Amino acid sequence: MAIGIFGEKLGMTHIFDDQGVSIPVTLIKIDGCQISQIKTCETDGYNAIQVAHGEKELSRLSKPLRGHLEKSGTKGFKSFGEFTVENPTDYKLGQSLTLDLFSVGQAVKVTGTSIGKGFAGNQKRHNFARGPMTHGSKNHRLPGSIGAGSTPGRVYPGKKMAGHLGNAKVTIKNTEVLYINKSENILALKGSFPGKRKNILKITKKD
């Protein structure tokens, strides 16, 4: 139950620490996050704040969305996300969320959507071994047995098989804030994170 912020993934680079060790980092652009709704147990059944991000002209939004934003006194945004908080009364409608929420060395949690790979087989999706490639074998990339015959007479749910790979919600926990550039609104986090460039990442302060 902690506040956070949304940002656009710019890409990866590296920085050097005091010992000269190269550390891989992901750069995230934080820009234009505002509180568009405050939810409480009395009105919505749970405590949370809704954060609008991704600026967009009001004239380009639907009429219901324009009304929702005008009620909160915020400008045009195209995307929304929520953070569950303990005391929603600590926040105000239209309040801007900036990099002041974070400090260097702080641990954060990052959530994003992984790159979609489409339909993939067992070798690519689950790292299965191949079958024999020579000596007359035709079982190169086949899945093999997926269950017994009349008992149980079905394929168990969750069986690892070919299917859609990627485009899934992925959360990376306990990553470190290494650098903050407030003039450019850029946050540098240690390591790599799901998605490609321009993907939206949700960065949450550790409880």
Residue ranges and their predicted role:
Residues 1-207:
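Extended basic (Lys/Arg/His-rich) segments that typically form rRNA-contacting surfaces
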